[in-house]
């Protein structure tokens, strides 16, 4: 099994968890998270992707992700650089996000997308989303086989309702429920 890893998220979560720690702690947590994912999906190999510094979506929609104003974790960029130099991560092609690279390579046989990003569920194939938790809630590991039909439905649903996480405005008056019912 070839695991396709969203290394942006792995690095972000590791850096966030080590905000007041030394960089070595962030590196260790990043490696532990990657090893945990690879073990759970029984990967024989992996490709991990980091988003390109440029993003074609911002050329199309200048407000794309403009709502993300929080300060980035202190070790994030250094951890991404480390992941590329020492952990075998790859920089996505110019203008593309890690998500795009995962979607492109998911077309190969024997792959599994490994991310907690809901947008990748638009891509047919095998998916793994690792356990996440917050104050008073927990979502367990999730393995999913996504169909092309359901992936397309999710894509069009998002086109209708928009995506608050990425600051993409949908059709006025059409939210989650109406978009879901339309499709």
Model-predicted segments: where are they?
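Non-catalytic, usually N-terminal nucleic-acid engagement modules in DNA/RNA processing proteins
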Residues: 1-47, 51-59
């Amino acid at each position: 099994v070839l695991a396709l890893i969203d290394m942006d998220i792995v690095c972000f979560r590791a850096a966030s968890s080590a905000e007041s720690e030394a960089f070595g702690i962030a590196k260790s947590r990043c490696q532990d998270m990657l090893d945990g994912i690879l073990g759970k999906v029984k990967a024989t190999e992996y490709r991990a992707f980091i988003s390109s510094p440029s993003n074609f979506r911002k050329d199309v929609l200048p407000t794309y992700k403009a709502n993300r104003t929080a300060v980035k974790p202190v070790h994030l960029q250094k951890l991404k650089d480390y992941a590329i130099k020492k952990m075998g991560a790859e920089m996505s092609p110019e203008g593309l996000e890690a998500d795009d690279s995962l979607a492109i390579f998911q077309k190969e046989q024997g792959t599994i997308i490994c991310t907690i990003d809901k947008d990748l569920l638009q891509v047919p194939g095998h998916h793994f989303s690792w356990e996440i938790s917050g104050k008073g809630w927990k979502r367990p590991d999730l393995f999913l086989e996504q169909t092309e039909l359901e992936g397309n439905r999710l894509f069009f649903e998002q086109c209708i309702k928009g995506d608050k996480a990425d600051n993409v405005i949908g059709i006025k008056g059409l939210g989650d429920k109406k978009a879901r019912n339309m499709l």
